[in-house]
């Protein structure tokens, strides 16, 4: 009887041990590639790695950069396999390396990407037709070159400052609210049409942050994000949407940012991920 009990105890212990071994996973590395321009540079190249590192999340971030690049130009580059990009890659050590004259095909083959994101250039970001003229073919090109597990992402960028002098602000009658709503509408319509499940709502996060004391320091020229405050809001949005972790309370912040500014930025991002189509006043 005693031997039988010992045998049962041993078998149970062995079973539990084996379950633990089977369920144990090596440290996951999340790999994100953005096909973008200076707005993807603003969003993912600065603070996203540090936000992730603070929570022991391992991440590799790639950005295919051409300033002001539209979806149409990305598609033409793909068709011609042009080495037209600056490929900025942040590795596991947090160091950014830039390789010039890189092609989309080469970037897609460089890693087993978990996420690949697309965005329209800022002036056309709220014009739905310009998304659909190029994105379906561009997305098909990408899907043919990445693993089946790779998730497609749309990056919902932000409206210009109310006083912006950007030449394309006329597309929205120099009206920030109109531009914001147009971007939200265009991105969500494109996502629905193409079956994209993930939208990173940086535009809504920035709009939320504009209800806080950060409002006057979110851009550096009326459209590109401020290198500290605006970029931090965008990175917080990417962090919460991609990693599915509440960014509020993450301890990483740029040195020049106050705790109150950090709180406003994080809450702006969190609210945007929760309600990506609705602006919330952050107190």
Model-flagged regions — what are they?
Residues 100-227, 240:
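Alpha-helical cap/lid subdomain in secreted, periplasmic
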Residues 38, 42, 50-55, 119, ...:
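Structured segments of extracytoplasmic/periplasmic soluble domains
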Residues 10-19:
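Bacterial N-terminal signal peptides
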Residues 28, 218, 222-225, 229-231, ...:
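Conserved catalytic region of serine esterases and O-acyltransferases that act on ester linkages
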Residues 2-11:
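Bacterial N-terminal signal peptides that target proteins for export
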Residues 30, 42-132:
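Conserved SGNH/GDSL esterase-like catalytic core that processes O-acyl groups on lipids
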